[in-house]
């Protein structure tokens, strides 16, 4: 199984764990993944890492659609890929949530399903350079001809010859968007994934493959969820350290009535806990919200504990049908363990 390393986005000060990324490359990790929310962006750090590495793939997990027009996202991904020597960048895309889309980027939430479809179609046209890029979509059209347009825009072809098959992966979780991912993308970054959900998710993917036609299927399609990894004798302590982030995302990373992280928690069978966490978090009772996160919820989406426990629990991930696993860890020994398990 392929391994990825998630380094996420930076906090108040920009910090890149360069030594950790270099170790990942030495250990044979396949990819390193950045992210963005409303601070550091996902693309710029990859350009820096491209100069320091030789082989490891460079993924955005994810670039938010509202942050850039699709042509701009294609330009950024294609430029970094060229800097890295070609064939190394994975353009991971996602919609984020309405609070960030409208509050940070000043864009309408609109119809995310159709925005994803239009966005990917335009990026592919930019990469392929078969003809000047024109697209008539339900959410995005090129050239732009809406309110305020002068009517002088014309289709263009990228000056830079980019990788025409630069892979596009989608970070999705709802049924409609998972089907869309299987239909139009090269890979999937599943939201809220745990191995026991695969029997439910597989038919969604199969329906997307059917819509794509051309014999598309699981062969050649990459599925890479994320899991936190920590070697420790204190399992409960490791799970407790995960809970503040869960409480933040389930409780506050989205509107009360439109929070994808809460929806994912409900889908995994923790509906009562999800509702309670959100109520406490929005009431500014943050410590109580953290305490309301069940141990079981954190445990099944991570690999924590003594080496023997991690080794045993890894089998569920390895056997569930995914092609890769992106890990989050601060421990070199955990990276070494995962590299040995994935061989």
For every predicted segment, state its role.
Residues 1-343:
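Active-site-adjacent structural elements that line small-molecule/cofactor binding pockets in enzymes
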């Amino acid at each position: 199984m392929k391994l990825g390393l998630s380094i996420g986005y930076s906090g108040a000060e920009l910090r890149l764990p360069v030594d950790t990324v270099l170790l990942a490359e030495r250990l044979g990790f396949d990819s390193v993944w950045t992210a963005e929310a409303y601070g550091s962006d996902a693309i710029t750090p990859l350009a820096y890492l491209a100069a320091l590495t030789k082989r490891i793939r460079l993924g955005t997990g994810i670039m938010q659609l509202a942050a850039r027009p699709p042509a701009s996202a294609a330009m950024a991904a294609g430029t970094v890929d060229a800097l890295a020597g070609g064939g190394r960048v994975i353009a991971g895309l996602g919609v984020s949530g309405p609070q960030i889309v409208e509050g940070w980027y000043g864009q309408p939430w609109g119809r995310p399903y159709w925005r994803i479809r239009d966005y990917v179609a335009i990026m592919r046209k930019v990469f392929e350079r078969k003809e000047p890029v024109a697209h008539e979509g339900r959410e995005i059209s090129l050239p732009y001809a809406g309110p305020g347009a002068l009517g002088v825009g014309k289709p263009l072809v990228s000056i830079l010859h980019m990788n025409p098959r630069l892979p596009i992966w989608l970070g999705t979780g709802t049924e409609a968007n998972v089907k869309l991912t299987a239909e139009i993308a090269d890979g999937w970054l599943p939201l809220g994934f745990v191995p026991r959900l695969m029997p439910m998710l597989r038919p969604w993917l199969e329906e997307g493959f059917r819509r794509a036609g051309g014999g598309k299927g699981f062969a050649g399609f990459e599925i890479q969820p994320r899991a936190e990894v920590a070697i420790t004798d204190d399992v409960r302590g490791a799970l407790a350290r995960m809970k503040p982030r869960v409480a933040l995302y389930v409780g506050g990373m989205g509107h009360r009535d439109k929070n994808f992280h809460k929806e994912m928690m409900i889908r995994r069978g923790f509906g009562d806990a999800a509702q309670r966490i959100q109520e406490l978090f929005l009431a500014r009772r943050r410590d109580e919200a953290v305490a309301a996160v069940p141990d079981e919820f954190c445990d099944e989406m991570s690999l924590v504990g003594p080496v023997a426990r991690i080794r045993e629990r890894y089998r569920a991930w390895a056997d569930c049908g995914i092609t890769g696993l992106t890990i989050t860890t601060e421990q070199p020994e955990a990276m070494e363990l995962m590299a040995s398990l994935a061989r």
